[in-house]
Regions:
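Canonical positions in the second alpha-helix
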Residues: 3-4, 37-38, 72-73, 106-107, ...
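Residue-level recognition of tetratricopeptide repeat
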Residues: 20, 52-55, 89, 123, ...
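Start-of-helix register in tetratricopeptide repeats
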Residues: 13, 45-48, 82, 116-119, ...
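Short coil turns that delineate tetratricopeptide repeat
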Residues: 9, 43, 78, 112-113, ...
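Alpha-helical adaptor scaffolds
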Residues: 153-162, 174, 178-215, 220, ...
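Register position in tetratricopeptide repeats
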Residues: 24-25, 54-59, 93, 127-128, ...
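Canonical tetratricopeptide repeat
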Residues: 17, 50-52, 86, 120, ...
Length: 270
């Protein structure tokens, strides 16, 4: 290759090979000039190795140079998936997540909107701490694929984090329930939201009963069941279960359980 380079130093392919070989033989100081020259000679052909090598460095200036070059190539090849994918990775590398989201729009125009797109949009919005947009993206995908369990979980986690209204929580928990019927946390939380929202107390009782049968010393589950009994007007049973909840309470749950305990005592006039 060196012989070929000596004969034709302005051949893009030879320059690219020189860079690749020096990289393979761990001579980094010699790699960049050849890859750069190959790119300069034929940017639409030899952009990949040059950009990848620039992005491997921790030097932000080199990463920004890669972005500049990739933007140029992307303009000349607006429908090339590989270019835009690497360009998006480059923006993520320099922590320009808003620009990475804009590149996702271009990728969607090439590949169509799909699970990978929705996942990327969800992740980027979460990195940007834009939970509202993250929720919107998850809900958008679930409109097309309502049975996607992973996105149902994402939605539920986001709803919990942002304290969404009970009707939205009930919808999210109910959608996931058929896929995870033995997830006691899910059953308990659905029962709780049905209870506090004035929903189906019969269903809430059934769900909550299942959890305390599975984990009879779980103070949170016992408290939920006691509060369902309270809302049904069954104060004797409510008192029995709230006492058990207090017996097994941990510091993180004790305060709310004590609040419910006082409310039940008031109804019993004790």
């Amino acid at each position: 290759v060196q012989f070929c380079y000596a004969l034709n130093p302005n051949d893009a392919t030879i320059n690219n090979y020189m860079g690749v070989f020096y990289d393979a033989f761990d001579q980094p100081q010699k790699v960049l000039p050849y890859l750069k020259r190959a790119f300069e000679l034929q940017p639409n052909e030899y952009w990949y190795q040059y950009a990848v090598y620039l992005l491997q460095s921790d030097d932000k200036k080199l990463a920004k140079l890669a972005i500049c070059n990739l933007e140029q190539v992307a303009q000349n090849n607006p429908k090339d998936e590989d270019i835009h994918t690497l360009l998006q990775k480059a923006y993520i590398h320099v922590e320009d997540y808003k620009r990475a989201l804009l590149i996702q729009d271009q990728l969607d125009s090439i590949l169509g909107y799909n699970a990978a797109s929705a996942m990327q949009r969800y992740r980027l919005n979460m990195v940007l701490h834009d939970t509202k947009r993250a929720i919107s993206e998850v809900e958008r995908y679930l409109e097309e694929e309502p049975n996607d369990i992973q996105f149902q979980i994402f939605r539920l986690e986001l709803y919990e984090e942002t304290h969404q209204p009970s009707d939205k929580m009930i919808e999210a928990y109910s959608a996931l329930l058929p896929h995870q019927p033995r997830n006691w946390i899910l059953l308990n939380n659905l029962a709780w939201h049905l209870c506090i929202s004035g929903g189906d107390l019969v269903m809430a009782e059934r769900l909550s009963q299942t959890t305390i049968m599975a984990e009879p010393t779980n103070s949170v589950y016992l408290d939920t069941y006691a509060w369902i009994m309270y809302n049904k007007g069954n104060y004797q049973d409510a008192f029995f279960y709230i006492q058990r909840a207090l017996e097994y309470a941990i510091p993180e749950t004790k305060k709310e359980i004590e609040t419910h305990y006082k409310a039940i005592l008031k109804k019993l006039k004790l």
